[in-house]
A protein has these predicted regions:
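Short glycine/proline-enriched coil/turn segments at helix->beta-strand junctions
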Residues: 31-35, 53-56, 80-84, 102-104
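Catalytic centers of nucleases
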Residues: 42-54
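Amphipathic coiled-coil/heptad-repeat helices and related helical stalk/stem segments
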Residues: 44-45, 70-73
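Conserved catalytic cores of phosphodiester-cleaving nucleases, focusing on short active-site segments
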Residues: 51-64, 77
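Nucleic-acid nuclease catalytic cores
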Residues: 64, 68-69, 78-112
């Protein structure tokens, strides 16, 4: 998980990006780090995560994040046996628990990578 966080934390995304542009930037960062990934992985019925990198699920959110909604989404992902850890990539900070169902959860906040607070 730390190699994935390190790879994603190295990217510097332009401010004006669509969500799928952010997907591409994250995928490119994982490629550069030599980390294999899968895009839009179906974990269960009506449960599709943006990326899986090994057993780590990566969800990418652009714009304003509704904390209750994203936490529920992460709970659905964490309930899936193939997910052993979760990383949420957002433009803005959102409070997250350190674990969900005993699985580690980490936040990568792009505005911190930009060196500004949004």
């Amino acid at each position: 998980m730390e190699r994935i966080i390190e790879a994603i934390s190295a990217l510097r995304a332009p401010l004006q990006q669509g969500e799928y542009d952010l997907h591409r930037l994250v995928m490119d960062a994982l490629d550069t780090a030599g980390l294999p990934w899968e895009h839009e992985v179906k974990l269960a019925p009506r449960c599709r995560i943006d990326l899986m990198c090994g057993n780590v699920g990566i969800e990418i959110k652009r714009g304003k994040v509704e904390p209750a909604r994203v936490k529920e989404q992460l709970r659905r992902y964490a309930a899936c046996p193939q997910v052993e850890a979760l990383i949420l990539v957002t433009e803005k900070t959102v409070a997250l628990p350190h674990t969900i169902y005993g699985k580690p959860v980490r936040l990568i906040c792009l505005n911190r990578l930009w060196g500004i607070a949004l």
